[in-house]
Amino acid sequence: MAKVTERYDVTWEEMRDKMRKWREENSRNSEQIMEVGEELINDYASKLGDDIWIIYEQVMIAALDYGRDDLALFCLQELRRQFPGSHRVKRLTGMRFEAMERYDDAIQLYDRILQEDPTNTAARKRKIAIRKAQGKNVEAIRELNEYLEQFVGDQEAWHELAELYINEHDYAKAAFCLEELMMTNPHNHLYCQQYAEVKYTQGGLENLELSRKYFAQALKLNNRNMRALFGLYMSASHIASNPKASAKMKKDNIRYAGWAANQINRAYQFAGRSKKETKSSLKAVEDMLETLQITQS
């Protein structure tokens, strides 16, 4: 196969810059990274200067994703020679163990790293990733809670914990995690939407009211969030049909549901879609409107 430089008429400098761009964007396009990176380290290592080390790491991770253990091991050996004893390189060794499904070896390695450096967040997160890969959600939850006791500001960890609680159907704790996220990210419409979905799933009139409120907030933050729009419709519809709701509450929520249904219809009509599944979705909305005796304007 022709080399990248020949196929695309690019220089090694352009390839190096492309690798840097992928790193900055956190791209996980493993096949491309591996193809470009392997040519760089094979043919231009002497020209790359200190960039060679971060490229070795980048290529190694891509090779693990792609199942190229030979390339991953080559990169790892080069990094070990240059940085003996480095925790970062040890973590890469652990990631290779993970790719080989040698989970116990990886856990032991991460534990040794944490004994030497208890603040090493990367090693902690790798341990959590292993628990999830093994389907040990309860252990992953325990590890994440311990992690968040020390690193309470890690938003990614809070969201990961919320997802794990949702998978375990522990919606009250999932809601708590999402509340933490909304406090620090009040303008993130996706957190509002997910919190609303959790409250909707919990059920009960009070939770449904909260659900409708946060679906509305998600829409306020992003008026193109169709999932939030459908959520607003569903939560308002269920409140309107709840026997514990007052007459005023039912009347208000019939109005909210009607507004949401009209917006859904308009969105589909504006998009000009005619697919069968879209028509079915619209028919379902219309049927629910009829059930609730909502008159569309």
From Swiss-Prot:
<comment type="subunit">
    <text>Component of the ER membrane protein complex (EMC). Interacts with WNK1 (via amphipathic alpha-helix region); promoting the ER membrane protein complex assembly by preventing EMC2 ubiquitination.</text>
</comment>
<dbReference type="InterPro" id="IPR055217">
    <property type="entry name" value="TPR_EMC2"/>
</dbReference>
<comment type="function">
    <text>Part of the endoplasmic reticulum membrane protein complex (EMC) that enables the energy-independent insertion into endoplasmic reticulum membranes of newly synthesized membrane proteins. Preferentially accommodates proteins with transmembrane domains that are weakly hydrophobic or contain destabilizing features such as charged and aromatic residues. Involved in the cotranslational insertion of multi-pass membrane proteins in which stop-transfer membrane-anchor sequences become ER membrane spanning helices.</text>
</comment>
<dbReference type="InterPro" id="IPR039856">
    <property type="entry name" value="EMC2-like"/>
</dbReference>
<dbReference type="InterPro" id="IPR011990">
    <property type="entry name" value="TPR-like_helical_dom_sf"/>
</dbReference>
<dbReference type="GO" id="GO:0005789">
    <property type="term" value="C:endoplasmic reticulum membrane"/>
</dbReference>
<dbReference type="InterPro" id="IPR019734">
    <property type="entry name" value="TPR_rpt"/>
</dbReference>
<keyword id="KW-0802">TPR repeat</keyword>
<dbReference type="GO" id="GO:0072546">
    <property type="term" value="C:EMC complex"/>
</dbReference>
<dbReference type="GO" id="GO:0042406">
    <property type="term" value="C:extrinsic component of endoplasmic reticulum membrane"/>
</dbReference>
<feature type="repeat" description="TPR 3">
    <location>
        <begin position="192"/>
        <end position="225"/>
    </location>
</feature>
<keyword id="KW-0007">Acetylation</keyword>
<comment type="similarity">
    <text>Belongs to the EMC2 family.</text>
</comment>
<feature type="repeat" description="TPR 2">
    <location>
        <begin position="155"/>
        <end position="188"/>
    </location>
</feature>
<dbReference type="GO" id="GO:0005737">
    <property type="term" value="C:cytoplasm"/>
</dbReference>
<keyword id="KW-0472">Membrane</keyword>
<dbReference type="GO" id="GO:0032977">
    <property type="term" value="F:membrane insertase activity"/>
</dbReference>
<keyword id="KW-0256">Endoplasmic reticulum</keyword>
<dbReference type="Pfam" id="PF22890">
    <property type="entry name" value="TPR_EMC2"/>
</dbReference>
<dbReference type="GO" id="GO:0071816">
    <property type="term" value="P:tail-anchored membrane protein insertion into ER membrane"/>
</dbReference>
<protein>
    <recommendedName>
        <fullName>ER membrane protein complex subunit 2</fullName>
    </recommendedName>
</protein>
<feature type="repeat" description="TPR 1">
    <location>
        <begin position="87"/>
        <end position="120"/>
    </location>
</feature>
<dbReference type="GO" id="GO:0005783">
    <property type="term" value="C:endoplasmic reticulum"/>
</dbReference>
<dbReference type="GO" id="GO:0045050">
    <property type="term" value="P:protein insertion into ER membrane by stop-transfer membrane-anchor sequence"/>
</dbReference>
<keyword id="KW-0832">Ubl conjugation</keyword>
<keyword id="KW-0677">Repeat</keyword>
<feature type="modified residue" description="N-acetylalanine">
    <location>
        <position position="2"/>
    </location>
</feature>
